[in-house]
Amino acid sequence: TLGNGSGGTAGVATNYSLVGGTYQMTVTQRPVTISGSRFYDSTTTVNGSDISAFTNTAGGQTLSITGSGTVATAIAGSNKTVALGTLTLADGTGSASNYSLASGSFDINSRQVNIAGSRIYDGTTTVNGSDLVITTGVGSEVLTVNGTGSTANANVANNKSVTAGTLALASASGNASNYSMGTITLT
């Protein structure tokens, strides 16, 4: 059945007729974009398991993804463009063959580090950055702490909470901007 066209050059359906026969139509793959995030790990790799969202699927269909891609830098940041590499769509509730992988964006979140340290009793509540040690858990990356914090009292105790005050992460062999401070304890 023909219908009237629209716009400035629209045709009127009654001016045309369809001749019997077989008509063909091409259905193309629907492009989808991906997004996801992970915590800083010093690599530029984006694994399929890091992808959490697919945009532009039809009728709420779901897909999954395998393989890996990359981002330009390993530094923590938002909306990084994903080079698709070997990332491949796989079936979910929708058939992957109906879709094409168009592009992706990715966030690398700063990794939270816990900070611990010890010092000899000195009668004060002040905690110096030099009293503290950070284990990043990322390769051989090392951070230091600058500034001062404080404890609730000067008494000797294990696992005392430290209020951050002016304590701040500083780069040593790791980039401090890839990390955020978690709990700080002093023994």
Stretch-by-stretch model annotation:
Residues 1-187:
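Short loop/turn motifs that initiate or flank beta-strands
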